[in-house]
């Protein structure tokens, strides 16, 4: 199985399966001299880890990360300094229940990658989905913690903006609320609505989809490239690689189909500091594949978790028609824990383009 890496100069390779002994990543291309602590990386993993509320999977994993290579310790004994060699990180799996999946060893779960993995490779790891499990994304979050340190002044934040048909009120958007509720919601008024709604979904053994919005501030103007190296092209590709993601939009995205040219234009003026300013950001901070210096804005849609208790029609690997009810511990809304994953993927993409621009033009330090 190939295609386990993404990025060009800031290149991330992930490894490991849902029910294996461990998983992790190798970050290749991190510049020397990047300073970070284990606690800083762990904080992002803690945001993603399972079992933190009744609205996510009850699998209990501490997701404690170990840095195995590519760094030296500073004199304070805590700060790690990248050496420029590959940074390898590992996270042990400690709460696997492979027996929960014995009944689907030959049965294909509708909506999962069971059938497609089997038809391509002739073998699949049915224990929690193996490599196709969202468990793999813990490694991406660890890599994202490094990426945030590569670009000076970069701030990447994300929030859940929709569950099912229930959307936030954007007039209530408050970043300080995101970490005060189990949904990473920026609108405190939507929290009780989502709680009641998801409780019903969860008790019925069903699942529901969601939309995550991720925003990067401090993105240097000029990074990216035209045609086949566009910044938004890579953002879309990398966000689409997240498990269960079925759609990505940049800026106003599909809503631009309803706008006139006058409405959609991001007009410009000269600011009081003599630098260009934009009067709007319909483009989501990217024009012609190149960053404008405005916030980079993306959203991605996540399908309902395919593992549900409702019996569904399917087939098995012997060609028999069967009914499948999925056991195990699963997220009723996988979009909740996708928030820090989206942050990590955007951070890695921007770090990669930052280094590519620095290598090509030499204008960024």
UniProtKB/Swiss-Prot annotation:
Pfam families, sorted: Chorismate_synt (PF01264)
Pathway listed: Metabolic intermediate biosynthesis; chorismate biosynthesis; chorismate from D-erythrose 4-phosphate and phosphoenolpyruvate: step 7/7
Reactions it catalyzes: 5-O-(1-carboxyvinyl)-3-phosphoshikimate = chorismate + phosphate
GO cellular component labels: cytosol
InterPro entries: Chorismate_synth, Chorismate_synth_AroC_sf, Chorismate_synthase_CS
Keywords: Amino-acid biosynthesis, Aromatic amino acid biosynthesis, FAD, Flavoprotein, FMN, Lyase, NADP
Listed GO biological process terms: amino acid biosynthetic process; aromatic amino acid family biosynthetic process; chorismate biosynthetic process
Listed SUPFAM superfamilies: Chorismate synthase, AroC (SSF103263)
Record-level Gene Ontology MF annotations: chorismate synthase activity; FMN binding
Taxonomy, superkingdom: Bacteria
Cofactor(s) required for function per UniProt: FMNH2
EC numbers on record: 4.2.3.5
Free-text comment on the cofactor: Reduced FMN (FMNH(2)).
Annotated positions binding NADP(+): 48, 54
PROSITE patterns linked: CHORISMATE_SYNTHASE_1 (PS00787), CHORISMATE_SYNTHASE_3 (PS00789)
NCBIfam families: aroC, PRK05382.1
Primary role: This reaction introduces a second double bond into the aromatic ring system.
Assembly behavior: Homotetramer.
Name of the protein in its database record: Chorismate synthase
Gene symbol of the encoding locus: aroC
